Amino acid sequence: MRMAAITKMLFISFLFLSSVFLARSGEVDDESEFSYDEKSENGPANWGNIRPDWKECSGKLQSPIDIFDLRAEVVSNLRILQKDYKPSNATLLNRGHDIMLRLDDGGYLKINETQYQLKQLHWHTPSEHTINGERFNLEAHLVHESNNGKFVVIGIVYEIGLWPDPFLSMIENDLKVPANKKGIERGIGIIDPNQIKLDGKKYFRYIGSLTTPPCTEGVVWIIDRKVKTVTRRQIKLLQEAVHDGFETNARPTQPENERYINSTYHSFGIEKQQ
């Protein structure tokens, strides 16, 4: 009986320690661990020192970068993006540092015969990538993941204009609901990612990383050359929905470190939405 009691106590202790470990490991998604304040101890320059599993944030293949298009190499075999997006059940999630739209089955992007499922999209204000040194008002990230855990992210930049972004217009009312409450999820029904209107003909491509901790490297980045328009009101809705201090949630540009930047089209400058 005594041995059974000891065994029971050890088992209970194991469960307690396991729960502590799981609670700690789940803290990676806590945005209070990092900030975008460049003067803060947990600001972007120090992300790689905050946690051992964030050390890649100090790596050599980090994103975002400044894309100087005269240095981009035109690659003739870069094809029009092979995407097969489709309407999907969608959930809007406030992650504290940004607003994410998660898709149950939004279709896929195919690169070199590998399918990358469209998992989610989110927004950064201002833009994270710059083009020829110019930073824009907003950047959307369409995050795709393959079956073996590799990422492709499509970045679309926006400037303030007279015309609202049609895709954001579809979810404007839903953006008001999870305001300033981290972890709030809300199903918003069927969303069609094709409404983003990405033609996929002219883009830059390079190898980089995720732009938030853990800053995983080896990410294929595709930056659309066309600058879309968004209204001040739409940007304000995105900023008001996140936690205080994350209204500006763009990581500074990182060293290029002589990486190859490929392009499907040779020209100087960017294309404006007509």
Curated annotation (Swiss-Prot):
Q: For the Alpha-carbonic anhydrase domain, which residue ranges apply?
A: 32-265
Q: Which domain of life is it from?
A: Eukaryota
Q: Hey, what tissues is this thing expressed in?
A: Expressed most strongly in nectary gland. Also at lower levels in the ovary, style, stigma, floral tube and at low levels in anthers/filaments.
Instruction: Give one GO term, molecular function aspect.
Output: carbonate dehydratase activity
GO cellular component terms, alphabetically, are: extracellular region
- Catalytic reaction(s) noted: 2 monodehydro-L-ascorbate radical + NADH + H(+) = 2 L-ascorbate + NAD(+); hydrogencarbonate + H(+) = CO2 + H2O
Q: What is its EC number?
A: 1.6.5.4, 4.2.1.1
The annotated site for Cleavage falls at 73-74
Q: What is its main location?
A: secreted
Enzyme active site: 97
Its annotated compartments are: Secreted
Q: Keyword annotations for this protein?
A: Glycoprotein, Lyase, Metal-binding, NAD, Oxidoreductase, Secreted, Signal, Zinc
Which parts of the sequence bind substrate?
Answer: 211-212
Q: Which GO terms describe its biological process?
A: one-carbon metabolic process; regulation of pH; response to oxygen radical
Q: Which InterPro entries match?
A: Alpha_CA_prokaryot-like, CA_dom, CA_dom_sf, Carbonic_anhydrase_a-class, Carbonic_anhydrase_a-class_CS
What the entry lists under Pfam families is as follows: Carb_anhydrase
Q: Which residues form a coiled coil?
A: none
Q: Which cofactor does it need?
A: Zn(2+)
Glyco sites are at: 89, 112, 262
For the ligand (Zn(2+)), the binding residues are: 122, 124, 141
Describe how it is modified after translation. Answer: Proteolytically cleaved to produce a shorter protein, nectarin-2.
Give the matching CDD domains: alpha_CA_prokaryotic_like (cd03124)
Q: Which residues form the signal peptide?
A: 1-25
UniProt function note: Bifunctional enzyme which has both carbonate dehydratase and monodehydroascorbate reductase activities. May be involved in regulation of nectar pH. May also regulate nectar ascorbate concentration, protecting floral tissues from free radical damage.
Entry's family note: Belongs to the alpha-carbonic anhydrase family.
Protein name (record): Bifunctional monodehydroascorbate reductase and carbonic anhydrase nectarin-3
Protein's organism: Nicotiana langsdorffii x Nicotiana sanderae (Ornamental tobacco)
Query: Corresponding gene?
Result: NEC3
